[in-house]
């Protein structure tokens, strides 16, 4: 399963009204696993029926393009409570929420912060985050190596 999979998955999902949140490859050579996390473009919750519909469509498309072998596992799911923040649109959508962010610009390199605002566009987006001590820090999104929503048990 090469790098050619992601553009095909992204295109197929867009046609169905979904966005690709995360694509992971795992398993073994004999039985590869392709994990796909999706989100609805209308920002409604992803249902089991959504996952089944996407799975059927992706399976047909991936097999037709000969991008997967005969013995593979395709897992389609919602992004979950600790969804990754990969794009500026993700950051904007979750302003006011807490996220675990890895960046050399944060004390210790990794912190749970509150997303206060996101400014800029075209690859120059900057997130204003509030650290655990209440200090606000500007972090260019290109300087973030990983970010995930932090699960809040109180919600």
Swiss-Prot record:
Signal peptide: none
GO biological process: ribosomal small subunit assembly; translation
Keywords: Cytoplasm, Ribosome biogenesis
InterPro entries linked: Ribosome_maturation_RimP, RimP_C, RimP_C_sf, RimP_N, RimP_N_sf
One GO cellular component term noted in the UniProt record for this chain: cytosol
Pfam families: DUF150_C, RimP_N
Function: Required for maturation of 30S ribosomal subunits.
HAMAP family the UniProt entry points to: RimP
Protein name: Ribosome maturation factor RimP
Lineage: Bacteria, Pseudomonadati, Gemmatimonadota, Gemmatimonadia, Gemmatimonadales
Gene (UniProt): rimP
């Amino acid at each position: 399963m090469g790098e050619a999979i992601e553009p095909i998955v992204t295109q197929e999902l867009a046609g169905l009204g979904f966005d690709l949140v995360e694509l992971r490859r795992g398993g073994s050579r004999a039985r590869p696993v392709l994990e796909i996390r999706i989100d609805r473009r209308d920002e409604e919750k992803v249902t089991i029926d959504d996952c089944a519909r996407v799975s059927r469509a992706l399976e047909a498309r991936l097999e037709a393009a000969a991008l997967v072998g005969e013995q593979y596992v395709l897992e389609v799911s919602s992004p979950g409570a600790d969804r990754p923040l990969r794009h500026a649109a993700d950051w904007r959508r979750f302003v006011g929420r807490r996220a675990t962010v890895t960046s050399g610009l944060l004390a210790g390199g990794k912190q749970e912060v509150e997303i206060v605002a996101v400014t800029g566009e075209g690859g120059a987006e900057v997130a204003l985050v509030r650290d655990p001590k209440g200090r606000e820090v500007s972090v260019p999104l290109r300087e973030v190596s990983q970010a995930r929503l932090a699960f809040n048990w109180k919600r």
